[in-house]
Amino acid sequence: MKKVGSFFTLLTSKGYKKVVLIPLAFCLGFFLYSLYSNFTGGKAEKTTYDDGTTRISAQSDLGSVKLPKILDSLNIPIHNELKIRNYDVLLDKDENITSIDIYCKSNKDANEIINWYKEKLNATDDRAKGEWNGFDMDVSYSEGSKLFSISLKKQ
């Protein structure tokens, strides 16, 4: 019983507050930073498989991730209201892009965004599907997950 009382005595004394509070604040700060980095800014992961193909992916649960620089030359149209949650980029042995899957979330009306993509892709049917910089591009919306899927496959 005396040991519990001595711990509270340590907390109430002026000189020893720093001994307890500084490490406690440091641990709390590290914990909050790890939560922040895990949920908001997913880091890109690069995985190389045995056959020589490579997969680049990133995911964010709360925030938005940025597309990798390798996709800058494709100039993929991303609607202003879409927040990218995750992406997968598959590369062949020669580091050429073979397919891209981008999943986005938005608070805007799904039909409005799908119609925007239909205009961009000059789609003539009901689907937002067309050709973009040498890739077959398909944009769809899932009611269940409330996610937009933007898929590009090499022609």
Kindly label every feature range from the protein language model.
Residues 2-155:
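An acidic-aromatic pocket/loop used at catalytic or ligand-binding sites
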